[in-house]
Amino acid sequence: MNYSKDEIKQYVAEEDIKFIRLAFCDLSGRQKNISILPDELDRALTYGIAFDASAIPGFGDEVHSDLFLMPDTATLSLLPWRPDRGRVARMFCGIARPDGTPFEADARQLLKKAVADAARLGVTFAFGTEMEFYLFRRDESGEPTKIPYDHAGYMDIAPEDKGENVRREICLTLEQMGVRPECSHHEQGPGQNEIDFRYSEPLTAADNAVTFRTVVDSVAVRNGLAADFSPKPLSGQPGNGMHINISAKSADGADVMPRVIAGILAHIRELTVFLNTVDASYLRFGGSKAPRYISWSSENRSQLIRIPAAQGEYRRAELRSPDPLCNPYLAFALLIYAGLDGIRSGTELPPAADINFFSATEQVKAQFQTLPATLAQAKAAAESSPFLARLLPQAVLDYYTK
């Protein structure tokens, strides 16, 4: 819920909050923040807090360097891992120009616009993520190593699964912040873990994904470990994915999911650079249940889009290519627009590819388009896309393609 200025100030006083983090993300999805004292709350909630945009790649230059953080009071949350005395709270922020207009390269604002555009068509989206990460040991100097915390396998239990207590601490911390995980387990790789989230409306789901990464990093440090979200931390081992579960419903009761899936399949090559943002992302494709071919099917985990065996409100499409280094605000916004394009254009869903791509012959696989094989190919696909040129500010497109 949105809190009034007086309610925020009262809460801060009652909870002995001494610092308020005003959080936002850069274009890559990395969280940034400015911390203010309670005395500055009134100014922050009325006028915003200025920051130097020229220091954030893609946000501006020295000539046009002033932007303002505008707190979203609905996102107020305590940070449970901070001290009980002199506590710390956080609010996510929108970004505005000095005249009060929204900053066009604010990915959170781009997602809000996508949600509003979908609502005008009578379509509501929801997203749930499946987040994978590795836990590595630290050396005697406290620096991260590539030594896995354990050597357990998929869904193993203690004592082989040493990450169980860490995952529990992560989930309980998230619950204290109002973020509700659905389940957690050990993944296939040594020291690899997964925590899944139920559906939320798009903005909340993206906020939760950013919060999750912060909590995992903080809990790992508290346990003398290092969390690694990179798409391919260890050669010869499974990579980290961020599977995105997508649900779309139409106000008129029509089943729009086939068109949404068709739209995403039609645009996935040009979207890939926003879902898989680093060179190592492309080392993950095609191995350990990570897709390479542009296809869909029911239940089949070798596909790009899988339709899980779920009914009713749990019916969804699972996009399996993204990884945890993506900007969730931008990723969700572009998936909404791809789905809406499928609905508007009446794009037909191609036949399901009921084959196992991990064991299929080259002759069979040659019938399907592939995701970009390298970051350079993904950048080229995005740069030449009329679809993206219509949707994204040039600064955002340049950041990802230059």
Language-model features and meaning:
Residues 1-402:
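Glycine-rich, acidic/polar active-site loops that bind/position phosphate-bearing ligands
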